[in-house]
Design a protein with these regions (language model features):
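Charge-dense, helix-prone N-terminal extensions
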Residues: 2-167
């Protein structure tokens, strides 16, 4: 008798599964219909991207930069990669970082686009903006500023040959 009961329950279960599979869905499963949320913008207008190493998080950061900043971010990234082959990338503290493996970080950009040279006082000519940190110098790029790519590339090349900042 127990055998007949288990056979009946197996048949009933098989019918339920077949009936469910045959019914068309009214909506897509939630995992398919979810839209990828855009990163939140922080108070300074920068995208909030999770801390991670590699090119992908830096590209996500650049893609999420608002308006004119996105174009500057792409240009900076291209210039840095062209100037320092094999450059290491990461996002830390909601900012993209660029460095040399085993030597630390050499620069970052944030805000309006603020390029931070961590050993900037060793660069010639000095990047224009001073910092409260004795070795750091900045290049601030605003929406209508012309970007001197030759000078920026020279600073990036010089910075890549100096000891980096360990973070």
């Amino acid at each position: 008798m127990a055998n007949k009961t288990s056979i009946r329950s197996k048949k009933a279960a098989a019918k339920r599964v077949a009936a469910k599979a045959a019914k068309p869905r009214k909506t897509e499963p939630k995992s398919w219909s979810r839209k990828v949320a855009k990163p939140a913008l922080l108070a300074g207008g920068n995208p909030q991207i999770a801390k991670a190493d590699g090119d992908a998080p830096v590209q996500a950061y650049i893609a999420a930069m608002p308006g004119w900043k996105r174009d500057i971010g792409r240009r900076l990234d291209t210039l840095i990669v062209r100037t320092v082959p094999g450059v290491r990338k990461a996002v830390k503290w909601n900012s993209p970082f660029y460095g040399i493996d085993g030597q630390g970080w050499l620069l970052s950009f944030t805000r309006y686009v603020k390029v931070a040279f961590f050993r900037g006082t060793s660069l010639r000519p000095l990047p224009p903006a001073a910092s409260k940190h004795k070795d750091v110098r900045y290049l601030d790029i605003h929406e209508d500023d012309a970007l001197d790519e030759a000078q920026l590339a020279a600073w990036v090349k010089q910075a890549s040959q100096l000891p980096g900042e360990r973070m």
